[in-house]
Amino acid sequence: MASENNGSRSDSESITAPKADSTVVEPRKIALITGITGQDGSYLTEFLLGKGYEVHGLIRRSSNFNTQRINHIYIDPHNVNKALMKLHYADLTDASSLRRWIDVIKPDEVYNLAAQSHVAVSFEIPDYTADVVATGALRLLEAVRSHTIDSGRTVKYYQAGSSEMFGSTPPPQSETTPFHPRSPYAASKCAAHWYTVNYREAYGLFACNGILFNHESPRRGENFVTRKITRALGRIKVGLQTKLFLGNLQASRDWGFAGDYVEAMWLMLQQEKPDDYVVATEEGHTVEEFLDVSFGYLGLNWKDYVEIDQRYFRPAEVDNLQGDASKAKEVLGWKPQVGFEKLVKMMVDEDLELAKREKVLVDAGYMDAKQQP
């Protein structure tokens, strides 16, 4: 699916004949997204395409494509007039690939969403997490800076931060709240945050940090607790699973809808001056509350199915994250549209339908459900 498009910017700009009133249509803005195949990347791509952008995504080469979240908007690049999303091979661990594609694509905006983003996994692979999340951001910032110097162009940069950076700092957490990271992932995100601030202050780069609190959707990875719950719930409802094993049910998070949060990313890069913003719903809910709403929605009692497994507790727990997004609301004019219960039910609906399709395959003998508890 990835394309090697080495054309200049003029090749990818919209070329529209003047209308009768001689008004010339402005060229399309071009965005470059790392992590385009992830939850946030897919929603941001949809959002930017809706704004008339041409979107380029950087994807890693692997043994199989992980593009299911963007397949519905992919158009073969040979269809030049309609293919406004293009994919290219690159990696945040490879500085030369980042610089090469920025020079080729000539983006107006760069959104760095790629990461090893699982907190628990970061304890297992801390070196890799730091290389991708922290040093990867530094490589991309340097590629953008070098490109702007050589080309004389202005490129706006968005860095995806995380509420995990606050760690054990008491809520509510705002842009002025001190960081106290409690995992290799969170520490790496702190480094990326300060690299972004440094490049803004030292080189005048238009660079923003979005400190996003937990944001979920039906596209959330199945190894994250919210999606793990709704995925298991769907399978339990149709008889494919009997147990769900979880860790700390009292952990409280500020959960929003990922589709809402990508608008805030874009709004940050439309301001006159770059700055950092917390993006959150300003509501806190525990994992147990998520279980109450999700299982209750399907008429089930979660206590009949959930068991606690110590392996899912982190070496250093983060108990309570709840954001103060007043700055984003005031400056950006942003506010969340999807509330907690609506979000949970949205995810349950999608995963129930997925489980029903899965059951058809299991009943037909095309899948084996025995690996589930």
UniProtKB/Swiss-Prot annotation:
**Gene Ontology cellular-component annotations:** cytosol
Q: What is its EC number?
A: 4.2.1.47
Query: According to the UniProt entry, which residue ranges have a biased composition of type Polar residues?
Result: 1-15
Tell me the impact of changing residue 153 to C. In mur1-5; strong reduction in L-fucose in the cell walls
Q: What class of enzyme is it?
A: lyase
Would the keyword Protein biosynthesis turn up in this protein's UniProt record? Answer: no
The pathway noted for it is: Nucleotide-sugar biosynthesis; GDP-L-fucose biosynthesis via de novo pathway; GDP-L-fucose from GDP-alpha-D-mannose: step 1/2
Binding-site residues, NADP(+):
35-40, 60, 91-92, 113-117, 128, 189, 215, 220
Q: Relate the outcome reported for changing residue 107 to L.
A: In mur1-2; strong reduction in L-fucose in the cell walls
What SUPFAM superfamilies does the entry give? NAD(P)-binding Rossmann-fold domains
Active site, UniProt feature: 162, 164 (nucleophile), 185 (nucleophile)
Q: Which InterPro entries match?
A: GDP_Man_deHydtase, NAD(P)-bd_dom, NAD(P)-bd_dom_sf
For this entry, list what GO says about its biological process.
Answer: 'de novo' GDP-L-fucose biosynthetic process; unidimensional cell growth
The record's keywords, sorted A to Z, are:
GTP-binding, Lyase, NADP, Nucleotide-binding
Report the outcome of residue 162 to F. Answer: In mur1-1; strong reduction in L-fucose in the cell walls
Q: Name one GO molecular function term.
A: GDP-mannose 4,6-dehydratase activity
To which protein family does this belong? Belongs to the NAD(P)-dependent epimerase/dehydratase family. GDP-mannose 4,6-dehydratase subfamily.
Q: How does it assemble?
A: Homotetramer. Binds to GER1.
The record, for HAMAP family, names:
GDP_Man_dehydratase
**What protein does this entry describe?**
GDP-mannose 4,6 dehydratase 2
Q: Which organism is it from?
A: Arabidopsis thaliana
Whichever gene encodes this chain, its name is: MUR1
